[in-house]
């Protein structure tokens, strides 16, 4: 897409310094061997874009050779994902805790392992968009409901 594409759906940063920090952090970690930004060759220009008074970060996908690379398990406030190849039998132990996991597999035993894992907050089995919101999910619905436990209290007068 282009900077002036009316169909683009990226949110700008309220604080441009945050976009600068994220962009710099990704670039700094890309200096370490064992990682490649696979989306760079498809972009026209830099990851960080300043236009029409807004600061934006374009989607970024990196391929890491191992989980030892600092970008292999990072989260940023922008469209970012890392890809690390690992044997399926080692995957749950290697990935650690995750807010969202999408598994595109027909292996029913592996699906059962994923369902049983306490490390995964939200599990998508199949090609489900992570942009699809389900308000009945704890981290997508009312945050008050998620953060605070309801309980009834009675007090003697």
Spans of model-derived segments:
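Conserved beta-strand segments of alpha/beta enzyme cores
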Residues: 34-36, 82
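Conserved C-terminal structural/oligomerization subdomain of aldehyde/semialdehyde dehydrogenase
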Residues: 49-157
């Amino acid at each position: 897409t282009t900077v002036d594409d009316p169909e683009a759906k990226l949110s700008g940063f309220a604080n441009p310094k945050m976009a600068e920090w994220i962009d710099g952090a990704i670039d700094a970690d890309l200096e370490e061997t064992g990682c490649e930004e696979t989306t760079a060759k498809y972009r026209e220009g830099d990851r960080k874009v300043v236009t029409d008074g807004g600061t934006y970060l374009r989607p970024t996908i990196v391929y890491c050779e191992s989980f030892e690379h600092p970008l292999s398990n990072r989260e940023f406030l922008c469209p970012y994902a890392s890809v690390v190849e690992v044997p399926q039998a080692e995957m749950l132990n290697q990935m650690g805790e995750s807010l969202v996991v999408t598994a595109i597999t027909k292996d029913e035993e592996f699906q059962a392992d994923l369902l049983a894992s306490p490390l995964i907050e939200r599990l998508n089995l199949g090609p489900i968009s992570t942009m699809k919101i389900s308000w009945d999910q704890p981290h997508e619905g009312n945050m008050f409901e998620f953060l605070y436990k309801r309980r009834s209290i009675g007090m003697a007068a």
